[in-house]
C-alpha cells in the first residue's frame, strides 16, 4: 500500500513540473532565419545572444569601412580621367602650331618633342640649355679630333681641369674655337679687309647691342675714303700681329727670334 502511495505522489510531481516548465531558445547557436517569423523583431533581438549582436555590429562596420575606399578610388579615377581630358585638349590646341613648326624647321620641332620627355630639361632648364650649347660645338671638336688627335686630347684634358670649363663650358669651347679661327682670320684680313670685317660679325659686341651703330661703322670702314684712315690701318695691322702677341706671351725668348712682319709700322 505504501508503495502505491509513493508512486502516485511521483506521478503528481512530474505532472506539476511539466505544466510549469518553459523552453529557452538557444539563439546563440542558431541563425536569425530559424527564429519564427511570427515573433516581432524586438522580441527576436531580445532573445539573441550578446556575441551575436556584437558580430552583427562588426559586420555592419566592416561593410561601411569597405565602402569608403571604393568611393574614394572612384573619385580619384574620375579626377584622373578629367586631368587626362584637359591634357588631351591642350595638346590638340598646340598640334597645329607644332605641325607648322615641323614644316618650317624640323630640327626645332624635334627639339620641342625631346624637351617634354627629357628629365634634365624638366629638372634644370639651365643645365639643359648648357647641354644644348655644348652639342653645337661637338662637330668642331670632332673635326679637330680627325685632323689633330693630339690637340683634341689636350683640349679634353684641359676641359676637366680648367676652372673656366667647370664654371662655363660653352664660353671655354667658344674661346678655343676662336683661337683656332684667328690664323685664318689674320690671312683673310691681309687679303681682303672688307671680308674680314664681315667675318667678325658674330663676335662683335657692338653688333649684338646696337645693330644700327654697327652698320654705320661698317659703312664707314668699307667706304673707299675711310680705308686710307690711319686708325683703320693700325687696327688691321694689330689684328695681323695678334698671333705673334700671344706667342710672345707664352715664350718671350723665342718671340725675339721670329721675323718681324709688321715692319711697315716702324
From Swiss-Prot:
Alphabetical list of InterPro entries matching this protein: Seed_Storage_Prolamin (IPR051529), Zein (IPR002530)
Domain of life: Eukaryota
Pfam families: Zein
Signal peptide per UniProt: 1-21
GO molecular function: nutrient reservoir activity
Record key words, sorted: Seed storage protein, Signal, Storage protein
Further remarks about this protein from its record: The alpha zeins of 19 kDa and 22 kDa account for 70% of the total zein fraction. They are encoded by a large multigene family.
Family to which this protein belongs: Belongs to the zein family.
Function in brief: Zeins are major seed storage proteins.
Name assigned to this protein: 22 kDa alpha-zein 8
Organism whose genome encodes this protein: Zea mays
Amino acid at each position: 500500500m505504501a508503495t502505491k502511495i509513493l508512486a502516485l505522489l511521483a506521478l503528481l510531481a512530474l505532472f506539476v513540473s511539466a505544466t510549469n516548465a518553459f523552453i529557452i531558445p538557444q539563439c546563440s547557436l542558431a541563425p536569425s532565419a530559424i527564429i519564427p517569423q511570427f515573433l516581432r523583431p524586438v522580441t527576436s533581438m531580445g532573445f539573441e545572444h550578446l556575441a551575436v549582436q556584437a558580430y552583427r555590429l562588426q559586420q555592419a562596420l566592416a561593410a561601411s569601412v569597405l565602402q569608403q575606399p571604393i568611393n574614394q578610388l572612384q573619385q580619384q579615377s574620375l579626377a584622373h580621367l578629367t586631368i587626362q581630358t584637359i591634357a588631351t585638349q591642350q595638346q590638340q590646341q598646340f598640334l597645329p602650331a607644332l605641325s607648322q613648326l615641323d614644316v618650317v624647321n624640323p630640327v626645332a620641332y624635334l627639339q620641342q618633342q625631346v624637351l617634354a620627355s627629357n628629365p634634365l630639361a624638366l629638372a634644370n632648364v639651365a643645365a639643359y640649355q648648357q647641354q644644348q650649347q655644348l652639342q653645337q660645338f661637338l662637330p668642331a671638336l670632332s673635326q679637330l679630333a680627325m685632323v689633330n688627335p693630339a690637340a683634341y686630347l689636350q683640349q679634353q684634358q684641359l676641359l676637366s681641369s680648367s676652372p673656366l670649363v667647370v664654371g662655363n663650358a660653352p664660353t671655354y669651347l667658344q674661346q678655343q674655337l676662336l683661337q683656332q679661327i684667328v690664323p685664318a682670320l689674320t690671312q683673310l684680313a691681309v687679303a681682303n679687309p672688307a671680308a674680314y670685317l664681315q667675318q667678325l660679325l658674330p663676335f662683335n659686341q657692338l653688333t649684338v647691342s646696337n645693330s644700327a651703330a654697327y652698320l654705320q661703322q661698317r659703312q664707314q670702314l668699307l667706304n673707299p675714303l675711310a680705308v686710307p684712315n690711319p686708325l683703320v690701318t693700325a687696327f688691321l695691322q694689330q689684328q695681323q700681329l695678334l698671333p705673334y702677341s700671344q706667342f710672345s706671351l707664352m715664350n718671350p725668348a723665342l718671340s725675339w727670334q721670329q721675323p718681324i712682319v709688321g715692319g711697315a709700322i716702324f
